[in-house]
């Protein structure tokens, strides 16, 4: 019996959840006109590259967009992702990867975690074991065939990627793009977004460590590639505060003062006032459904019961 003749409720579920559908394009939170000049510059660099403006179609585009909280990194990233999605729909031989280290950050850009995208074994106990898992995956014929189409890499929260993580990505892309194994990230174009003041790679050397022979030899010169990115832009215009509430404006200002070691007595007093021991029972109830972060899986399981 044709599935269309089955229960209508089941068929609707089948159509909406089981059958493949055309992916929806990313919708940036603001129009292009409302972006700052540096945000527009990031987007135009990618747009011109994808269109081959200035005979740059076959050149490797390398962009590093840095900025503090509220500078509009996410808005610029989503505009870039929209351009990449449009290119992917128009060209069957073009694909891209949008990734981030943490699951939450990857979810926010509708992408993948770095471990998933580049087949890095998260349970490996040593960096050598992780690199071995990367090399093994990169030699898989099916994986290599897919990555032949991957021409662009988009990474959010680049500050969380230390030298080891960057070397895993670099090695994977070099192996899956034969002929470009001497080029950074296999010769594919990339655009990285992040804040160098934010959390650094866990159990890893920061990409911003001073250059030295030890790190160069240990991580295959990936730090030289990183410091050699030609298009490095700092988004320094406050983007969120123009349309946020007063409390949100203070919060983003607080984050920036904290990153610059410029906290005031008023900042510290406000933060102390929000400690759980200083909140009323009604205020504490408002946080019952908020995101809770715990250091141990056991505590997570206890919370979720």
Identify the meaning behind each predicted range.
Residues 1-305:
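Conserved ATP-binding/catalytic motifs of P-loop helicase motor domains
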